[in-house]
């Protein structure tokens, strides 16, 4: 379960309750050995299609946009407003292509082997609010942060100030999960502020 290779790099984050029943189906009773994996034609076709979209997002979009983003973010001083806005939009495309591409590759590879991993991105840039965005963006991470960090911290069951602190803490750590750099720390904190304002209004 821990070493299931398709989703080790960037998710989706799979919980034991979702994955172990699928694994048990593939283990022979008595011997405990893994059954011979039979690749079904329908799973193969769909899996390859999902992986192809993942590679397209990652290698064609994310990897080709990355130099533009790096160039703008490495030295934003002196750049005009349009260039900075272009950098922000390009970064949004890059991060989506990167993470959703990786998870599509993982979902497709797992499906070929006969395992179903949960959908991880659901058109996040069509979200109508910050809360809706986090129901669509890196869904397995969002639900993990909610269940194992936000709710244990008290969620929204305590004072308003405590709720806002919980949101900021979770989003700060969520930003760090996406990448250990100041860009992602700021990204996470900004999302925490957006969620707090959305709850406030």
Feature roles, as predicted:
Residues 1-201:
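Membrane-embedded transmembrane alpha-helical bundles that form the catalytic cores
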